[in-house]
């Protein structure tokens, strides 16, 4: 269990509780979770973070009524800056989006502006929102993470409790390499409900070469770990930076969707540009 799982800041969340579904607009349904909850134990301070990045959300179940009452549908793309005070709790996000279902808006831009305003207020940070008509995305290919997949190793694993021990002495030699590693075996659990979260991970770095077996064992150790998606990515970034000390590092996870939403956080200390094309499990 995470050290802050019972923190009072989490007590009021609708996550893990029975809730009513509202279909008329209600911004109060949105709930934020302080990023400091997991950053403080990691020694990360808001005014001196070792990374930049965003939380990229895809909204697959977004609908409202136009001014004449005709339903509209869209796919939404949201990017929340890493400097925001709060991350956005996903169940509250789903409930908030449901509140658009029977609400009339004059035009698509009013919907976009409403989302941008409410999400920014909840997160207390910078946010951008784009809405796409379905025909704009039709034929979009399934993407893949560029890099070398480390999953097909012939190793025995019998411990699934989170530990950074595997990263001790996890670099090889003195030669500096630049490579991109990929794993599809990331599985963690929701901080509150302990429901499984499934993700694919891309790690891009420059530095002494990281032992791939040790890295895979470390990633598999998240299997019983309870934390939100964004928190896991920041933990992985921080642990790799601390133990492997690369000159450059980027960590990007794309998680499978739940409740019509997928969350795709990335953190980097270089000029990393993430691909936003959905992966095969998304």
UniProtKB/Swiss-Prot annotation:
Its EC number is 1.7.1.13. NADPH binds at residues 90-91, 258-259. GO terms for cellular component: cytosol. Its main location: cytoplasm. GO terms for biological process: queuosine biosynthetic process; tRNA modification. Optimum pH is 7. Retains less than 20% of activity at pH 9. The active site is at 190 (thioimide intermediate), 197 (proton donor). Gene3D superfamilies: 3.30.1130.10. InterPro entries: GTP-CH-I_C/QueF, NADPH_dep_7-cyano-7-deazaG_red, QueF, QueF_N, QueF_type2. Substrate binds at residues 88-90, 229-230. GO terms for molecular function: preQ1 synthase activity. Changing residue 228 to W: 11-fold decrease in specific activity. Changing residue 190 to A: Loss of catalytic activity. Pathway: tRNA modification; tRNA-queuosine biosynthesis. It catalyses: 7-aminomethyl-7-carbaguanine + 2 NADP(+) = 7-cyano-7-deazaguanine + 2 NADPH + 3 H(+). Optimum temperature is 37 degrees Celsius. Displays a half life of 28.2 hours and 12.8 hours at 37 and 40 degrees Celsius, respectively, but at 50 degrees Celsius the half life time drops to 6 minutes. The keyword Disulfide bond does not apply. Keywords: Cytoplasm, NADP, Oxidoreductase, Queuosine biosynthesis. NCBIfam families: QueF. Belongs to the GTP cyclohydrolase I family. QueF type 2 subfamily. Homodimer. This is NADPH-dependent 7-cyano-7-deazaguanine reductase. It comes from Escherichia coli (strain K12). The lineage of its organism: Bacteria, Pseudomonadati, Pseudomonadota, Gammaproteobacteria, Enterobacterales.
């Amino acid at each position: 269990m995470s050290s802050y799982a019972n923190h009072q800041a989490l007590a009021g969340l609708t996550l893990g509780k029975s809730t009513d579904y509202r279909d008329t607009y209600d911004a109060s349904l949105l709930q934020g979770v302080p990023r400091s909850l997991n950053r403080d134990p990691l020694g990360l301070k808001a005014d001196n973070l070792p990374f930049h990045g965003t939380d990229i959300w895809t909204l697959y179940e977004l609908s409202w009524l136009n001014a004449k009452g005709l339903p509209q549908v869209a796919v939404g793309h949201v990017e929340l800056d890493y400097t925001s005070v709060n991350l956005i709790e996903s169940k509250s996000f789903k409930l908030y989006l449901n509140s658009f279902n029977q609400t009339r808006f004059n035009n698509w831009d009013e919907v976009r502006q409403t989302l941008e305003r409410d999400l920014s207020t909840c997160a207390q940070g910078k946010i951008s929102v784009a809405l796409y008509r379905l025909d704009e995305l039709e034929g979009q290919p399934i993407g893949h993470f560029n890099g070398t997949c480390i999953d097909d190793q012939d190793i025995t694993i019998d411990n699934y409790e989170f530990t950074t021990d595997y990263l001790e002495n996890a670099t090889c030699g003195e030669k500096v390499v630049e490579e991109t590693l990929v794993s599809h075996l990331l599985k963690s659990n929701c901080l509150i409900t302990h429901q499984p979260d499934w993700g694919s991970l891309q790690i891009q770095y420059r530095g002494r070469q990281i032992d791939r077996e040790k890295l895979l064992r470390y990633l598999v150790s998240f299997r019983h770990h309870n934390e939100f998606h964004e928190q896991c990515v920041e933990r992985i970034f921080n642990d790799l930076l601390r133990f492997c000390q690369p000159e450059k590092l980027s960590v990007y996870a794309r998680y499978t969707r739940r409740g019509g939403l997928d969350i795709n956080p990335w953190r980097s200390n270089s000029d990393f540009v993430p691909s936003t094309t959905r992966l095969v499990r998304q």
